Amino acid sequence: MSSATSGEYWLISVPGEKGANDAWDKLNRSTGNTSTNSKYLIPDLKVGTLDQLVGLSDDLSKLDTSAEAVIRKLVQYFTEVLEEDKSKIAENLVIGNKDMKTYVTKFQWEGAKYPLKQSLKVLSEIIGKQISQIDNDLKVKSLTYNNLKNALASMDRKTVGSLLTKDLADLVKADDFVLNSEYLQTVIVVVPKISVKEWEQKYATLSSMVVPGSSKLLTEEGEHALYTVTLFKKVIDEFKNTARENKFIVRDFVYDEETLKAGRTERDKLMAEKQRQYAPLIRWLKINFGEIFAAYIHIKALRVFVESVLRYGLPVNFQAAVIEPAKGQQKKLRQELHKLYIHLDGSAAGPIDTLEDSPALMSLGVNEYYPYVFFKLNIDFLNK
């Protein structure tokens, strides 16, 4: 049987029947080749009062939305951190040693994290705190790592672009300059390639006190060439102005070995710190994806339990299932489920065939209504 590749699952529950597996067997017979079904093993939880269940239904809906939002945020950031290793994201989205599909279809309640002796309200609060903690930690860790990345990116941006703007540190060396002179200074000039001959003919006349023969070509990139020229310090401003009038741009650059070395050292430090933080961050993202995904599926289990009790009443007796629609079979599957469970909505007014048959439900903002408890689960977090 071919299954859907969209990561979509339907979490449903229907009333239990006399035989332990009667409801389950009936579901499997009816859905046939339209889906792959797994039991959603939700344990006996503390029911509480009807008022508590109604309030909890709304709380769990909000918690569900919040958990999914944090998961998507974490996965998106995980993908960004992996950078050129983005293809490895899927293998890191695991819960312990299980992939998402296995965790969902072979779900087992984690009693150590979410003790069954606790009330539904307390369980939802435990999960809520867990989600908030992961969300807050993600903000802190992403801010710290992003600051490093941004500082490195800022440094790297200076090494690209045209000779008019880029950092010159890697293009020059001490031998290109007259250093430690009381009177002389070497400046760097950006010359349009089409004006190179003009520069070589005119540079010594752009102001007085330019050292003849001191112009030296350092490099050429794109539409510009980079030259040095040596002149007396007291005429530098005059030289800059005259050069600009001739479309020769004097870069604001003074060669200082210590400053250049410090810049290179700073980048090396940032790169080393980024590499130092990378592995622990990947590990944290992987572990906490597993934590929040597990919490998310437990929220779904709580929602199925609460809605089943509200809809089917006491004593608690329902069959929950994880249904994976086969590719292209969603419509047919929905029809089969409708035929199988339409009787659950039997009333004096007759069963609800479509949502339009119930203005009351539509007025409450219900967008999807089925005669059985239904929640959609989409585990494709890599696509929005």
UniProtKB/Swiss-Prot annotation:
A GO biological process held by the record: embryo development ending in birth or egg hatching
A GO CC term assigned to this protein in UniProt: vacuolar proton-transporting V-type ATPase complex
Membrane topology: Peripheral membrane protein
Tissue specificity: Expressed ubiquitously; higher levels are found in gastrointestinal and hypodermal cells, as well as H-shaped excretory cell.
Primary subcellular site in the record, as a coarse category: cytoplasm
SUPFAM superfamilies: Vacuolar ATP synthase subunit C
Cellular localisation: Cytoplasm; Membrane
Pfam family, one: V-ATPase_C
Disruption phenotype: Worms display embryonic lethality. When vha-11 is silenced in adults, they are able to produce eggs but egg numbers gradually decrease and worms become sterile after 24 hours. This sterility continues for about 4 days and then viable eggs are produced again.
InterPro entries recorded: ATPase_V1-cplx_csu (IPR004907), Vac_ATP_synth_c_sf (IPR036132)
Single GO molecular function: hydrolase activity
Keywords recorded for this protein, A-Z: Cytoplasm, Developmental protein, Hydrogen ion transport, Ion transport, Membrane, Transport
Family from the record: Belongs to the V-ATPase C subunit family.
PANTHER family the record matches: V-TYPE PROTON ATPASE SUBUNIT C
Further comment: Vha-11 and vha-3 are transcribed on a dicistronic transcript where vha-3 is the upstream transcript and vha-11 the downstream.
Subunit structure: V-ATPase is a heteromultimeric enzyme made up of two complexes: the ATP-hydrolytic V1 complex and the proton translocation V0 complex. The V1 complex consists of three catalytic AB heterodimers that form a heterohexamer, three peripheral stalks each consisting of EG heterodimers, one central rotor including subunits D and F, and the regulatory subunits C and H. The proton translocation complex V0 consists of the proton transport subunit a, a ring of proteolipid subunits c9c'', rotary subunit d, subunits e and f, and the accessory subunits vah-19/Ac45 and vah-20/PRR.
Function: Subunit of the V1 complex of vacuolar(H+)-ATPase (V-ATPase), a multisubunit enzyme composed of a peripheral complex (V1) that hydrolyzes ATP and a membrane integral complex (V0) that translocates protons. V-ATPase is responsible for acidifying and maintaining the pH of intracellular compartments and in some cell types, is targeted to the plasma membrane, where it is responsible for acidifying the extracellular environment. Subunit C is necessary for the assembly of the catalytic sector of the enzyme and is likely to have a specific function in its catalytic activity.
Record's protein name: V-type proton ATPase subunit C
Organism for this UniProt entry: Caenorhabditis elegans
Gene assigned in the entry: vha-11
